[in-house]
Amino acid sequence: MTFTAVLENIARSTIATKIGEKLKTAKSIYLSGLSRLGKGLISTHLCQQQTKPLLIVTVEEATRWALQLQSMSWRVYLYQPLDTFPYESAQIDLETAWTRIEILAELLAKPQPNLAIATTIKALQPHLPSTQAFQKHSLYLNIGDSQSVKLLASALARLGYVEV
């Protein structure tokens, strides 16, 4: 059975109708309890029914999602995360930068109905330091506390502030 035949069967199912009605009012849905293939089939049906692009945000499986969606005739972009650690220079390679720019440019232009983007949560988050590193490089001031100007100036200089 081809994916087209499976999608036609899904289109006739009551669950697809119920999810489609919920999507009209909720604007987004969270599918749980299905396999990746099941979620992909339902998502494909709903997006094709509404002629809308598809965005898949997952914890780690963006590449697998991209491959699955390609087999379902989507034009898929993989929005990859940067593999860097906090306080490491975020040197982005040209291929990743070009792919991200291409995805964003396509979204700014008129989006095509068969456009799908697969990404991870990490790729969408800004490059942030860990909580411990952030606290180590922070200065906490409380109302009513007093400090000498020299100590305050040296603490601010240690944090990277420059006297003007």
Q: Which role does the model predict for each range below?
A:
Residues 1-164:
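ASCE RecA-like P-loop NTPase motor cores
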